[in-house]
A protein has these predicted regions:
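Short, functional C-terminal segments
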Residues: 1-6, 11-12, 16-17, 83-94
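Charged low-complexity stretches with an acidic bias
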Residues: 56-94
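Long, leucine- and charge-enriched amphipathic alpha-helices
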Residues: 6-62
């Protein structure tokens, strides 16, 4: 099995890598991925409103300021999203 750990794409901050990929990939691929992310955000916001979860969400967001474990979970989730997003763009670039 090949060792890919030395590849440049796996070095550094995933969010910085995502920014590089979004801004340097084809405009069509970047646009498609950004629209997918916006649709997901709109879906989540609509769900929160429809289920009357605004107060619960705001309370959760406030807890983020003081809860280090929650901050780590959010950062981990953000990294997962960034990696998936990069994969979506790069796989469309083949």
């Amino acid at each position: 099995m090949r060792d890919y750990s030395e590849l440049e794409i796996f070095e550094g901050n995933p969010l910085d890598k995502w920014n590089d990929i979004v801004f340097h990939a084809s405009k069509k691929l970047s646009k498609k991925e950004l629209e997918r992310l916006l649709e997901l955000l709109a879906l989540l916001e609509t769900f929160i409103e429809k289920e009357d979860l605004e107060e619960k969400f705001e309370s959760f967001a406030k807890a983020l300021r003081i809860d280090e474990e929650l901050q780590q979970k959010i950062e981990s989730r953000k990294t997962d999203i960034v990696i998936q997003s990069m994969a979506n763009i790069l796989s469309g670039n083949e």
